[in-house]
Structure formats: structure tokens, C-alpha cells
Amino acid sequence: MLSPVNVSIESLNLMTLVPMLIPIIGALFIIVIDLFKSEQDKSLYVMLSLLILGVDFVALVDSAGVFANNGTIMGVFDMMLIDGLAILSQFIIVGASMLFIPLALTHKRFHEFSYPEFFALFLFMIAGFQFMVSTDNLILIFVGLETASLALYTLIAMHNRDKSFEAAVKYFTMGALAAGFFSFGSMVFYALTGSVEINQIATVLTANNYADIGFVLVGVVFLLAAFGFKLSMVPFHTWTPDVYEGSSAALAGYMSIVPKIAAFIVAMRLFEFLIHSGVVWLEVILYMGVVVTMTMANIWALVQSDVKRMLAYSSISHAGFVMAAILIGTTQSNSALFLYWILFSFTNLGSFSMLWISRQKNLPAHQQSDHSYDKFAGMVKTSPVAASIMALFMLSLAGIPPFALFWGKMYLMSSAITGGYTVLALIMALNSAIAGYYYLKLIVYMFMKDPVVENNGHVYSANATLPLKTIIGIAAIGTIFAFVAVNQLIEFVTLFVYNSGY
């Protein structure tokens, strides 16, 4: 006869679920409102979503205080793991989401924002990403990954452009393949160690001195491929330009930030112990992936004729940059990862939001792209403020001081040198120089060429709604004045990373 199992509510520590339950309950609340009052103005759903995210942010602040006083918090049969990595990444996820949602207050022709399902799916997606970063259990990571991914596929398809459904299908196909790779890699590690918890997997493999190195490499390759799809690492990046092009510019900017920080955290938890295992092949595989991703993405970005696709390849290169922090594997590099991505979030979301200002409802028959370089030619004459702000974001992405990403790149390359990866730091510097060309190319078009279409100015002014101006203004202020807070930000991030044992 089986003995009874006694589980106390205190041992479950259900408070660890609060940051995830808030967006889930909020999404269900929006659906219920729509059931009873289906003709509500979309601004109600925007305000509700912002309120829900604000409450979620407050809950994260409370979790940060508990972590600062008590250290890592475990809950729900030790499946939930609330440490510094989880808290910092959730701040980025929720913060970027709060910057994205007001963009829904735009013209009615972007009809996906008129549906309450859009906001409910968006909140479910956020909860999925929060689960991903708040556990070291491979099963729960997979559940969070699929929850977020399925919602994101639908959000892409809801955009009312011809390429949106194609983009959603491509993303779904690649996502399904990534899910298969993740499942197989997890299965290999479970077969080797009898556990699906990353901490236990590390303990067992270390105790066995990596005796089954062949199977370990198989598991690593499959998991790296899964992360490669989610992080757009070469050669798993092929979906990225097409999906970004088929999505709205704002959603593309959001996709370049939030899904990737979730994947970065899972990769950091998993590869941190593998890189320090002393098995040189594990390090070599990741090293090659980082260098190839940074370099090839920059080369492809150089030859793009569409600004949106250029920014898509640029995002791939930046993801390779940040993966270098995981390869280096020191507290300084892991702190640099968060610093870099926080600063990148302001700059890249601002860049894609500027593309949204230049959007057109109906493209001319001869025009295949809504964001060709020619469209930005002479922008300083038709809309000088828009040209100046776009130039600001391009200079930051290029790493030009004193703008935001300069500090992220410097701190990351410094961590590479300190960690003994001097050659990698040189490769990163070289790639930054290459990237500078295609960022400055757009600035040249805006400031040194004559307008191809003389009346483009009315397009910018018509599209620049107050919410869009506000978000771009916040992004621009963060990009310009990052140097004021960068030292305090490094100290804050390092404290949380160090106290998490990374």
C-alpha cells in the first residue's frame, strides 16, 4: 500500500507563480469582457493590457526585493526557479511589452489591433516567456516555449498584409522543427542522467566525468540547433528576414528583443556548465556558431536593398554578439549580456517603430518593398525630425559613442578580453566596423541624397500618432542618455547575476 504524500502549501511556495499568473488571468479577463461586450473600443483593451503589465512589473519588483534578501527562491515542487537571471530577464520582457502595447493605438487599417484576441494572445505569450526563464526544468521550459510560440505565430498571421500569413507559416514550420530538436536533445540528456532539471544534469555528468561524451555532444548539437532557430543563429536564421518583413514593423522589433532574451537565459543555464566542463569540443562548437553568426549576418546585411530586411540581418548579428557572452561564461560577461540587451531593446524597438512611421497602406504596383532605401532618400528635407531620430538609432546600433549600444559593446568586448578571449574580442570589433557601413548607408541616403518621392513628408506626419511619438521619444531618450545610468545599471545587473551563481 502506498504511503500518503503530504504536501504543504508553504512548501509549494505558490508566490513564485504570481508574475506568470497575472498575464494569464489578465488574458482570460479580456476574453470574458469580449464575450459579454464584443463592441468595446480597442483602446479599452490597450489600457487593460497596460494595467495588467504594470501590475506584473510591480510583482517583479517585489520578487526582486525577496531575492535580494533571501537569495534564490524555489517553488512548485522545485520546478520554479526565481533567481537573478529570471528576475532581470522578466524585467526586460515586461518592460519591452509595455513599450509595445501602446503602439496598438494606431489607425484602424491595421485591423489586428481591433480584436481583443490579439491582446489576450499577447498576454499568454508573455506568460510563456516568463515560464521559460523562471525554471531549469526542461519540460517546463518546453511548455513555456510552445505557449509563447503558438501565440506569436497567430499574432504574426493577424497582420493584414499579403506576406503575413506566409511569414506565420514559415515561422510555424521553423518553430516546429526547433521544438523537435529541443525535445530530442532533452531526451538525450534525460537518458544520460535520469533528470530533466539542468542543475541535476550538470551534477550527474560531472560526477561521471562526462564518460558518455559522444551522447553528450549529440544532445548539445540538437539543443544548440533548437536555440539556433529561436535566436536566428546561422545557419538556422533563414526564416528571420521573411518573417520580419511579413510582420508589422513594431511586432518585428518586438520579436527581435523578447523571444531572444528568453532563449538567451535558457542557453545560459544550460551551456554554462557545459562550457566549463573541460570538454574542448563543446566550446569549439559554440565558438564557431558565435563567429559565423556575427560575420555572415553582417555580410548579408551589406547587400540588402530593403531597410527592414537589413535590420533583420542586423538583429541576427547582435544575437551572435550576445551569444559570445554565454561562450565567455564569466560573471562580467553574463552581466554584459543583460546590459547589452537592455540598451539594444531601446535602440532596436525605436528603429522598427520609425519604420512604422514610414509605412503605406497601399504600395504602388512597381514597388515590392515598403521600406526600400530609396524611400528614405532625402528624408531630412521631407521630415527632418524623423530623419534625425532614425540617424540617432542607426548611430547607436553601429556602436558610435556616446549612444547606448556603444557602452554595451565596450563592456562585452572588455569581458571577452578579461576572460581570455582576446581573438574573439577582435572579431567582435571587426564585425562592429563592418556593421557601421550599412547603418551609415541609411544615414547617407537620408541626409545626402535627393528625395525620390517629394511628398513623402505627409506620410510621416499622418502615421506619427501620439502613442507612437511617445514610444519613439522614450526610446530616443534611453539611447541618448544611457551613459548617465550605465554604471548604476552595471552594478545592479552584476549584483543579481553574481548572487545567482553565474
Curated annotation (Swiss-Prot):
PANTHER family: NADH DEHYDROGENASE (PTHR22773). It comes from the Bacteria. It is found in: Cell inner membrane. It is an enzyme of class 7 (translocase). Belongs to the complex I subunit 2 family. NDH-1 shuttles electrons from NADH, via FMN and iron-sulfur (Fe-S) centers, to quinones in the respiratory chain. The immediate electron acceptor for the enzyme in this species is believed to be ubiquinone. Couples the redox reaction to proton translocation (for every two electrons transferred, four hydrogen ions are translocated across the cytoplasmic membrane), and thus conserves the redox energy in a proton gradient. The lineage of its organism: Bacteria, Pseudomonadati, Campylobacterota, Epsilonproteobacteria, Campylobacterales. This is NADH-quinone oxidoreductase subunit N. It catalyses: a quinone + NADH + 5 H(+)(in) = a quinol + NAD(+) + 4 H(+)(out). The gene is nuoN. GO terms for molecular function: NADH dehydrogenase (ubiquinone) activity; NADH:ubiquinone reductase (non-electrogenic) activity; quinone binding.
